[in-house]
């Protein structure tokens, strides 16, 4: 999409690259660009990632005929909920079961096909999607909170909805300033 390319140009080419060009180890960053193109009935979703200065994307994650959930950051809690297993499973199978990479991939595919939670569907009401987003954010926060070590996720969350007819709309928003300086929309 043109918008995803423009976001990549602004975020990566014009800001990230000049800021970190001289660094030996560059920070990783990733973001998702999602929404409705002009005159389109269905939304699209693109992912852009920068790993140590190497850019991947914009990559089409979800086309106009697909629905789903995308998450980044601390994925473990949501991976377990949606897929039914930990992201560490392939490494455990390789180390403890001495399985080949091909056998591991086949097993992971079988588990995903049979254990993935179907929590999202095409006719899902917007309020259900909002509630699911809130649930997944708090699931991740609490998973991090109760895992050994310092919590790496927390604080107030922000939720926005993008619909064809209402466009971008804040649902839950952190207000750092008074509402006249930081308006709802």
What are these regions (language model features)?
Residues 1-185:
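N-terminal nucleophile
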């Amino acid at each position: 999409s043109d918008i995803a390319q423009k976001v990549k140009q602004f975020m990566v080419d014009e800001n990230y690259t000049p800021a970190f060009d001289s660094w030996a180890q560059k920070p990783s960053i990733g973001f998702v660009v999602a929404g409705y193109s002009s005159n389109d009935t269905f939304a699209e979703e693109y992912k852009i990632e920068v790993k140590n200065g190497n850019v991947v994307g914009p990559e089409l994650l979800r086309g106009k005929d697909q629905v789903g959930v995308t998450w980044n950051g601390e994925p473990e809690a949501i991976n377990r909920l949606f897929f039914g297993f930990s992201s560490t499973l392939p490494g455990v199978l390789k180390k403890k079961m001495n399985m080949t990479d091909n056998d591991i991939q086949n097993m992971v595919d079988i588990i995903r096909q049979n254990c993935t939670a179907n929590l999202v569907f095409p006719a899902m009401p917007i309020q259900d999607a909002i509630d699911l987003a809130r649930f997944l954010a708090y699931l991740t926060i609490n998973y991090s909170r109760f895992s050994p070590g310092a919590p790496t996720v927390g604080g107030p969350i922000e939720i926005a909805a993008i619909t064809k007819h209402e466009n971008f709309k804040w649902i839950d928003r952190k207000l750092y300033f008074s509402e006249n300086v930081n308006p709802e929309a």
